[in-house]
A protein has these predicted regions:
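Intrinsic-disorder/low-complexity, polar/charged segments enriched in Ser/Thr/Lys/Arg/Asp/Glu/Gln
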Residues: 63-69, 80-82, 121-123
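Short beta-strands within extracellular/lumenal beta-sheet-rich domains
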Residues: 54-74
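Aromatic-lined ligand-binding clefts that engage carbohydrates, nucleic acids, or primary amines
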Residues: 75-95, 124
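Short, flexible loop/turn segments at beta-strand junctions in immunoglobulin-like
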Residues: 74, 112-117
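Catalytic-domain carbohydrate-binding cleft regions of carbohydrate-active enzymes
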Residues: 2-44, 54, 88-90, 116-307
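Solvent-exposed, conformationally flexible loop/turn segments
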Residues: 61-63, 105-106, 117-121
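Solvent-exposed beta-strand/loop surfaces of large extracellular or lumenal domains
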Residues: 44, 52, 88, 92-111
């Protein structure tokens, strides 16, 4: 096995430790529907049914409403809490009457703590849409969890090990560079060597995953502080959304898709005051104001703040 392959393998192990703790929500209920206008739905059943891990859920071009009352376990009370749900659908999450965020194929986790006060009971109301075309049809092995019909893998209240998460982000960036032919071969060879050396500092056989701090310090000192491969100029990270009003979905679904997009950007703005975002279509502002006035007011405050 080449050093870079050994690094890749251990990077997969490292990602398993992002969550410090995970507590499964076991009382979820689901009701399937089909959207017939911007805010009207035709339900397939008269009532909700239980949603358990391993169940098939969602339908092509289908909507699902998911709910649960969750008592936060004592061992998690007072901690920074996250909600985790792996899904191929696009889900807007409301907790105790407030839209808190969203999950989708690109983000399985959303922060809860600043938005739930100190309440020990959380009422989840979720609305999800799954488009008519699989999210990733290139990989047949993933269709069971990323297709139009998918296997429910569970929903969790979690705590995050931020040291591990930060290290994962650093490795993700550097591994992408090391595998890209857009960068010169000397730099890529340097990265493959030093990423392997950094990963060697982590003891994956220890109960507490020893070596995280040492690995991070090695990356900071040897890779990020290295002047031999530095270029000139600044890098700007810019977020923009030009939402396809109709693509692999109908126009009426753009109302909820836009809500999720806006929610995710608002939460990034909450966390990163320097984060700026542009949303360029009048139609999506109009539907947000019409159907989700509370979120629209929150958006207006961000506009006032220059975000």
């Amino acid at each position: 096995m080449r050093p870079e392959e050994w690094t890749d393998l251990r990077f997969g192990w490292l990602k398993r430790y992002i969550y410090s703790s995970k507590w499964e929500i076991t009382n979820l209920m689901i009701r399937d529907a089909r959207q017939i206008s911007e805010m009207e739905f035709e339900y397939y059943s008269d009532d909700y049914r239980p949603l358990n891990k391993g169940d098939m859920y969602f339908t092509p071009d289908g909507t699902a409403f998911i709910k649960a009352d969750v008592d936060i376990p004592k061992e998690l009370q007072g901690k920074e809490l996250w909600f985790s749900l792996k899904t191929a659908a696009e889900i807007c999450v409301k907790i105790n009457g407030k839209y808190v965020g969203g999950v989708d194929p690109n983000r399985e986790r959303m922060l809860l703590s600043p938005y739930i006060d100190d309440k020990k009971t959380l009422h989840f109301d979720m609305m999800g849409y799954n488009r008519s075309k699989p999210d990733d049809e290139r990989n047949p092995e993933s269709l069971s969890v990323r297709g139009c019909r998918q296997i429910f893998e569970g929903a969790y209240i979690c705590t995050v090990n931020h040291k591990v998460q930060n290290l994962v982000w650093d490795f993700e960036l550097l591994l992408d560079i090391a595998k890209s032919e857009l960068f010169n071969e000397d730099y890529r060879n340097f990265l493959n060597k030093e990423l392997n050396n950094a990963m060697n500092l982590i003891d994956f056989d220890s109960d507490e995953l020893d070596g995280i701090d040492e690995c991070q310090k090695y990356l900071d000192d040897v890779v990020f502080a290295n002047d031999n491969y530095k270029g000139n100029g600044d890098v700007a990270l810019i977020a923009h959304s030009h939402l396809d009003i109709a693509y692999y979905w109908r126009r009426i679904h753009a109302v909820q898709k836009n809500l999720r997009t806006v929610l995710i950007q608002l939460r990034l703005m909450d966390k990163y005051p320097d984060f700026k975002y542009t949303h360029t279509q009048p139609y999506v502002y109009e539907t947000l104001e019409k159907y989700y006035p509370d979120v629209f007011e929150e958006l207006k405050e961000k506009v006032k703040n220059g975000q």
